[in-house]
Regions:
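Pocket-lining segment of extracytoplasmic ligand-binding domains
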Residues: 122, 201, 206-293
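Conserved C-terminal helix/tail region of periplasmic/extracytoplasmic solute-binding proteins
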Residues: 329-360
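Short helix-loop capping/hinge motifs at secondary-structure junctions, enriched
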Residues: 157-164, 194, 260-269
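Secondary-structure end/capping motifs
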Residues: 263-336
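N-terminal secretory signal peptides
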Residues: 1-19, 26-36
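Bacterial lipoprotein signal-peptidase II cleavage site
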Residues: 38-51
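Short, glycine-/small- and polar/acidic-enriched structural segments
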Residues: 48-191, 202, 218, 238-240, ...
Length: 360
């Protein structure tokens, strides 16, 4: 699947963005090499690199603050905010650093090798518990019945129709330690499934459908936008969505920032959060147009691109965070009292949250 690089972004960028992208071109090309190398590293390798060199120094281009961000093929508000011009009129711009594997995003935010990243709440909680310097600064996607965060697929001829049928089978998801693992295991245990009898393997979302079709997995958990392609595959059937499993409580995918960047560039963080919130609200109001933009970005047939929904104004609320603190404690992954909800997030940089607070 073609992946948009900084150079292709420059070629296709609207005139209002082209000059800024040219300005960052040299930085982005160098950073892309580093980002791709880091994507293949283990969590331990990333930690060692950061320990040896310290947090990455924040780069500036002219009077613009450049924040380092992955250039992944996905439905992401940073790319949409950039495309929609929501960084125009600010002193802040994204500096895309190449594709970074999903499991590496939060570890690299925690070390400062990238400045922002979007991954699920349990990964952020675990990183904070281990001493990483990061914080959630904006909410992200939300699960609706008509717009789930993730969907569960099997082959039509698999004979798998209920949770108990999964014992002895192989489940593919995009990473351990996140929503796909913990929401699924919680649900399966509620239905008396012995999860130790299930083989869990990591498969990137963009490869999950094909891996299931070819029989290398028995159930695939796939996130939007790629889940739409599996919905349209003739040989597959959808069993559930995460809305069926927990009513959507575990579906918030927030945006986190490195602590050093927050402390050094609070105005840039406000710029980013405001742009994200505007983009999220735009997606909620323009779902079909958003799908078209993402289809173009990831080079996928529009009919196969699943829609997204976002938390209004991207204001972070506490229940989704407490939900995962409780799960991590029950899984033995987090000591009681090690991380409190308030340790995980802040709405300080969200102008919409400040407006809500002023009204109340």
């Amino acid at each position: 699947m073609p992946i948009e690089t900084p150079s292709t972004s420059l070629a296709s960028a609207p005139p209002s963005r082209r000059l800024a992208l040219k300005t960052f071109a040299s930085l982005a090309s160098v950073a892309a090499i580093g980002g791709l190398a880091l994507a293949g590293c283990s969590r331990e390798d990333g930690s060692k690199s950061a320990a040896a060199g310290g947090p990455a120094v924040v780069k500036k281009t002219g009077d613009k603050v450049a924040f380092k961000y992955p250039n992944n093929p996905s439905f992401d508000l940073i790319y949409l905010a950039d495309e929609l011009g929501y960084f125009e009129g600010t002193n802040t711009r994204p500096e895309y650093v190449g594709k970074i594997a999903a499991p590496q995003i939060i570890p690299l935010v925690g070390t400062g090798e990238i400045d922002f990243g979007s991954r699920m709440v349990p990964l952020v909680i675990s990183a904070i518990a281990s001493g990483a310097d990061l914080k959630v600064v904006a909410a992200g996607g939300k699960t609706l019945q008509e717009a789930p965060h993730m969907k569960y697929f099997v082959r039509k001829d698999s004979g798998i129709r209920n949770p108990k049928d999964l014992e002895g089978k192989t489940i593919g998801f995009n990473s351990f330690g996140a929503c796909a693992e913990f929401v699924t295991k919680k649900y399966l245990r509620q239905h008396d499934v012995d999860v130790t009898k299930i083989n869990f393997v990591v498969i990137p979302d963009e490869q999950a459908e094909q891996t299931l079709v070819t029989g290398n997995t028995d159930l695939a958990i796939i996130h939007a936008p790629f889940s739409g392609r599996a919905d349209n595959a003739e040989s597959l059937v959808r069993l559930w969505s995460d809305f069926d499993l927990d009513g959507g409580l575990g579906g918030m995918a927030p945006y986190s920032a490195h602590g050093q960047f927050i402390r050094q560039h609070p105005e840039a963080v406000r710029d980013v959060v405001a742009a994200l919130a505007k983009a999220g609200n735009w997606v909620n109001a323009n779902t079909e147009e958003a799908r078209k933009l993402v289809a173009k970005r990831i080079n996928m047939d529009l009919k196969n691109v699943d829609r997204y929904a976002y938390v209004d104004d991207l204001v972070v609320t506490e229940p989704p965070i407490q939900y995962y603190i409780d799960i991590l404690q029950s899984e033995g992954k987090l000591a009681a009292g090690k991380v409190a909800v308030k340790d995980v997030y802040t709405n300080e940089f969200n102008p919409f949250a400040q407006q809500q607070a002023a009204k109340s």
